Every structure is written in structure tokens, then in C-alpha cells.
Amino acid sequence: MVEKVPMTPGGFVKLQEELRWRQQEERPRIIEAIAEARAHGDLSENAEYHAAKEAQSHNEGRISELEDLTARAEVIDLTKMSGDKIKFGAKVKLVDEDTEEEKTYQIVGDQEADVKAGRISISSPIARALIGKEVGDSIEVNAPGGSKAYEILQVSWG
């Protein structure tokens, strides 16, 4: 059975845009670079040729990965999400019970995670601890820097 990959509509669009760019812009540019490097003669010591072939390999690998991800994507319509329990797509406001520092995170798919932008992967330790909880609940997260305790202040959607 094919495992679905949950993602937000915005995350899906970003993957589609990257796939289009790699197929329609980057692939032709690399093919042109290979042809140009090949024209320089001896390929055994041709650094430009080897660099272009390596770039081609990387690009084709990423294209395959993006095609797989978009085929398995389960786009979750966040506008239809509601309720008090935390699940995929929720924006969660937390307070660190030790430092009183407040943080807001949105739980997103693995491909969309960007901690600096406040988006955490659904498979991250903190998101796994949050799933199923509600406002007022406390969670404990075992992170590389040690154990942290948070209280859930707010859950919102969209």
C-alpha cells in the first residue's frame, strides 16, 4: 500500500513549482552545459563536463523524488479544519513552563517544515507530543538539549 504524505495546499504548490522548474528550466540548462563541456574535447579530464553530469544526476534524482511526493500527496484543506484537539495543520501557541517564553507553531508535512518560519514537521518530537492534546494541556518533549515542558495556550486553524 502506498503511504500518503500529508501536506498543506501551500506546501503542495511549492513542490509542484519546484518540479516544474527542475523539468522545464534546470534540465535544459544542464543538458546545454553538458553539450558545451563535451565540445571542449577530452572528457576524461574535463572538469566542466564532470560537474555538469553531477548536476544532472542530482537534478534527475530530485525530480524523481518530487514526482513521488506529489503522486503520494494528501492535500489537507485547512479551511475545513476545526475543533479543540490538535491535529495536522493546527497552529498551536505554547508557553515554555520554565522560561515563560511563548512560541507559535503550525504542524505541517515533513517537506514543508521550517522552524524559523514557525512550521514544524508532523513527525518532529514536539508535534508528536502535541497531536490529540487541547488548550490547557501540558506536554513534555525530549529534545537534544534535554526535556522541555510546555503548556498549550491556543489552538487555531487556517
From Swiss-Prot:
GO terms for molecular function: DNA binding; RNA polymerase binding. Gene3D superfamilies: Transcription elongation factor, GreA/GreB, C-terminal domain, Transcription elongation factor, GreA/GreB, N-terminal domain. InterPro entries: GreA/GreB_C_sf (IPR036953), TF_GreA/GreB_CS (IPR018151), Tscrpt_elong_fac_GreA (IPR006359), Tscrpt_elong_fac_GreA/B (IPR028624), Tscrpt_elong_fac_GreA/B_C (IPR001437), Tscrpt_elong_fac_GreA/B_fam (IPR023459), Tscrpt_elong_fac_GreA/B_N (IPR022691), Tscrpt_elong_fac_GreA/B_N_sf (IPR036805). Keywords: DNA-binding, Transcription, Transcription regulation. One of its GO terms (biological process) is regulation of DNA-templated transcription elongation. It comes from the Bacteria. Signal peptide: none annotated. SUPFAM superfamilies: FKBP-like, GreA transcript cleavage protein, N-terminal domain. Pfam families: GreA_GreB, GreA_GreB_N. Necessary for efficient RNA polymerase transcription elongation past template-encoded arresting sites. The arresting sites in DNA have the property of trapping a certain fraction of elongating RNA polymerases that pass through, resulting in locked ternary complexes. Cleavage of the nascent transcript by cleavage factors such as GreA or GreB allows the resumption of elongation from the new 3'terminus. GreA releases sequences of 2 to 3 nucleotides. HAMAP family: GreA_GreB. NCBIfam families: greA, PRK00226.1-2, PRK00226.1-4, PRK00226.1-5. Belongs to the GreA/GreB family. This is Transcription elongation factor GreA.
